[in-house]
């Protein structure tokens, strides 16, 4: 990982595990000066969405209590959507909207609302457009 030794970057990942490439365990927390600046939340396939959202909210709360970002970058993995043929986390559009809202509220408090979002995954073209649209709408909301 590019920033694993950098204490100026906090890296958070919530993802299906085990999954390719096999990294992202809870024990991976950074390296050298960056130790403690990585938080992985590995989830088993089909983890109930309520548990995923609880884990997400808890992780963001933990990060916000010890790290004050200048900017938040979201690398949105929409392959966690329930309609996606690849992932098996089964999140719905409303789950992505709620998680986006949590990050946006943190950004509003911590870094004047500065958020960049890029798309990382999502392979069902029938659902992807609406999911991305809902995510972007939430980012744009006041």
Per-region residue spans from a language model:
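A general "terminal functional-core" signal
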Residues: 1-142
